[in-house]
């Protein structure tokens, strides 16, 4: 696709996934999540971080199925809704890593929410498009 870019690599069970680094604002330890009544798919509650109410959006069921291991951290990422943007807390199962790689185009058999692939030494990592994933979950 283009020159190397920065990505945040995160574990979800046995696999790794990535988000473009410019979308990620922080990695946080699991805080006290507040459960609130709602009907939004995969939203499991909210966190209050630095005075901001942040929805917790557990994407593990979409990526690895219902048997994903316990989440250890929250990856706080920016997600767009039309012209608006908000923070979203994504529970992940382990330590995250910042890396520079060239993203290649996804192959035909990847899910629609995969915007590209990163070739690592022992794994091909899917780069997730949060907006496409949200649209897929909502439908």
What is each PLM-predicted segment?
Residues 1-139:
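An acidic, low-aromatic, low-complexity terminal/linker signal
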């Amino acid at each position: 696709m283009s020159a190397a870019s920065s990505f945040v690599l995160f574990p979800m069970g046995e696999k790794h996934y990535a988000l473009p680094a410019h979308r990620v604002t922080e990695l946080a330890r699991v805080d006290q999540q507040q459960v609130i009544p709602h009907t939004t798919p995969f939203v499991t509650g909210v966190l209050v971080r630095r005075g901001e109410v942040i929805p917790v959006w557990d994407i593990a069921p979409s990526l690895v199925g219902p048997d994903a291991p316990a989440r250890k951290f929250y990856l706080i990422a920016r997600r767009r809704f039309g012209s608006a943007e908000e923070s979203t807390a994504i529970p992940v199962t382990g330590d995250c890593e910042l890396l520079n790689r060239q993203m290649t185009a996804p192959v035909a058999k990847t899910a629609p929410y995969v915007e590209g692939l990163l070739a690592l030494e022992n794994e091909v990592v899917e780069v997730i498009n949060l907006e496409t994933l949200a649209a897929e979950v909502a439908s």
